[in-house]
């Protein structure tokens, strides 16, 4: 075999042999580029940011309505307006990031220079200064905190694109995607302790530490963890995918770049699926209300979470095999439909099918808790599958953009994606606050500042409807939307082969131009 290869190579003239070597080098998908230290850094950054985002997303609305004292309508309007602003800001930040050139790379600097912005904003999100006496002052405080947090994250989230830049190997990239999504599961452990501390610490300390103080303490802790891991990631990670020069970037104007991005069909299908998938966050934002008021304790949510997340540790490592067998698109479609059916069944059977205790079953009971945990476990089975598939499909969008228009422009594609994503968030953010108002909930606290449990059946049924039906709608529409994602199957195989040829032609052209300059 080696002799045949040697004869074949000997028969080639020097130029053909050079091309053959280029092809062999370009096809070398088994080569390892990422060092172990970088894998650790990327996973730690993922861990830190997952901790922070999980904590903020799950508790911000509950804290601001229950302790800061703003209404659900005011909160929803703030999030709605901020999301519109954030969408416009992302358009600018994407262009700035795409054209950034520093000795530390294009993306890494934003991992460290944004830390003070979102770090301070996180502290503001979970504090209620005594100087805030009226509704107007409280709303202004909330506006500054929410706007500053999302502004910092608009630029910091450039680190997500590092996933597609720290290695040119598709195999390494896909493996890192699956590993990072698996590691994200660990990133929910610390935030999951919040309900336990909120429930028991005020009792243990005889009211010296109230519920509000627990949320504030966790906010500080999450900000410190996220900041430390981000700084470590900045120093440990490297960018390896070659960047286009400033001259090459200028060949395609900003307007043309936006036109190319807008005409990117798979990108828009992914945007639409993400828009519908975002409605699950409306249900997620009601979790604290549901567990406290419907079941009687926030701890119930933590107990359920200990079991509902366990299957993900098995399913996430298996997801690459599912993608290899069925394709990322088809796997995502199946996961979405499965999740929609599961959440619909959860709503049909209600959250307490077994009436226990007095007052029409207001005492939740162990049997109901076991049932709810089992149902939520089934509902959560496709979660990690969807997250892995989304990351893989995002890589397909970048590849399609390079194949179709000749320029990868990841930051620009991410900009357009984020633009529409933030517009979608404005809708779901508005719904999150408005839905709480629609069900008729008004927060009440006792003398120690702790939230008093709601008992009105109409309000409790409203909480559960948001909790179950919004995720059901989100999962169904997510799966259905991806039917129109065209980068899959034979088309994807042919596209990647053609893209490899185009890359080789680009390399040969650059080498030829370099040789001409050397001769002259």
Give the predicted meaning of each segment.
Residues 1-3:
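Soluble N-terminal domains of membrane-associated systems
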Residues 5-519:
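Membrane-embedded alpha-helical bundles of multi-pass transporters/translocases
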């Amino acid at each position: 075999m080696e002799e045949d290869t040697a004869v074949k190579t000997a028969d080639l003239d020097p130029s053909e042999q050079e091309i053959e070597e280029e092809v062999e080098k370009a096809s070398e998908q088994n080569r390892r580029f990422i060092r172990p230290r970088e894998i650790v850094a990327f996973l730690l950054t993922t861990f830190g940011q997952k901790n922070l985002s999980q904590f903020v997303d799950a508790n911000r609305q509950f804290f601001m309505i229950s302790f800061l004292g703003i209404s659900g309508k005011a909160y929803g309007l703030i999030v709605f307006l901020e999301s519109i602003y954030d969408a416009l800001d992302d358009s600018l930040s994407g262009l700035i990031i795409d054209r950034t050139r520093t000795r530390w790379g294009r993306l890494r600097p934003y991992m460290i220079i944004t830390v003070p912005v979102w770090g301070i904003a996180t502290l503001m999100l979970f504090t209620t200064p005594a100087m805030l006496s009226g509704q107007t002052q409280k709303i202004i405080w909330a506006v500054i905190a929410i706007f500053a947090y999302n502004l910092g994250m608009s630029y910091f989230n450039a680190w997500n694109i590092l996933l597609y830049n720290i290695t040119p190997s598709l195999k390494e990239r896909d493996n890192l995607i699956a590993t990072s999504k698996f590691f994200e599961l660990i990133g929910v452990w610390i935030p999951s302790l919040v309900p336990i501390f909120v429930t028991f610490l005020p009792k243990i300390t005889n009211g010296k530490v109230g519920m509000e103080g627990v949320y504030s303490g966790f906010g500080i802790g999450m900000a410190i963890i996220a900041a430390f891991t981000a700084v470590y990631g900045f120093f440990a990670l490297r960018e390896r995918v070659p960047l286009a020069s400033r001259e090459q970037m200028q060949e395609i104007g900003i307007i043309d770049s936006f036109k190319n991005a807008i005409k990117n069909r798979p990108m828009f299908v992914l945007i639409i699926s993400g828009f519908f998938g975002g409605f699950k966050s409306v249900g997620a934002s009601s979790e604290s209300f549901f567990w406290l008021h419907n079941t009687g304790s926030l701890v119930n949510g933590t107990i359920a979470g200990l079991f509902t997340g366990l299957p993900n540790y098995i399913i996430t490592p298996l997801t690459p095999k599912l993608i290899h067998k069925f394709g990322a698109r088809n796997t995502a479609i199946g996961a979405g439909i499965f999740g929609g059916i599961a959440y619909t069944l959860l709503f049909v059977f209600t959250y307490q099918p077994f009436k226990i205790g007095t007052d029409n079953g207001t005492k939740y009971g162990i049997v109901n808790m076991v049932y709810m945990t089992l149902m939520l476990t089934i509902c959560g089975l496709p979660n990690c599958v969807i997250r892995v598939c989304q990351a893989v499909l995002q890589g397909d969008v970048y590849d399609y953009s390079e194949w179709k228009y000749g320029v990868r422009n990841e930051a620009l594609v991410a900009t357009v994606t984020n633009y529409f994503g933030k517009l979608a968030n404005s809708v779901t953010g508005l719904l999150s606050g408005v839905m709480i108002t629609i069900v008729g909930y008004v927060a009440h606290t006792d003398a120690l500042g702790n939230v008093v449990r709601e008992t009105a059946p109409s309000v409790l049924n409203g909480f559960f409807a948001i909790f179950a039906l919004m995720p059901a709608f989100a999962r169904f529409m997510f799966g259905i939307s991806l039917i129109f994602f065209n980068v899959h199957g034979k088309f994807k195989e042919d596209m990647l082969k053609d893209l490899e040829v185009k890359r080789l032609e680009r390399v040969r052209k650059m080498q030829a131009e370099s040789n001409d300059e050397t001769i002259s």
